[in-house]
Amino acid sequence: MTVDPTWVAAAAAITPGFETVGDPFQAAAGDFDGMGISCGALQWNIGMGSLQPMVLAVGRPVVLAAMPVHGARMWEACSGTVNRGLQIVRGWQSGATLKSSAKAELRALMGTPDMRAEQQKRIDAKAEIAMGLARDWSMARDGTEPTKRLFLWFFD
């Protein structure tokens, strides 16, 4: 099933607005939720293991180029265990707040064309799941196709 691209764009604009400011694809937040760091439009993170596959997919050269100071450690954080990754990224923070150099580099990484493409792949996959759930619910309720509003509800 294909989801209307304008609906996906709306979901990608609305959902991050609850947790991010500015370009959601470049969002980077500290350990406010116990997940180490949370990055990107849908706040993928180290603690749940959702950020690591994205970092590995873009490759070490992209990470090192975008993160000249912290890139090698970011690669290590995403290549090892979740516990080791949490330990590394928590070292870049004061309490639950990212230090400015780490935040700037994470934002740079998340904003690279390769990482934007990785984020979009995952947004599109989530949109397909959301549309399936919305369609199932709508069909069971009254036999109609889901509305955009219903799709957005299931996306978030």
Each model region followed by its residue ranges:
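Cell-wall polysaccharide-cleaving catalytic domain and substrate-binding groove, primarily
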Residues: M1-D156
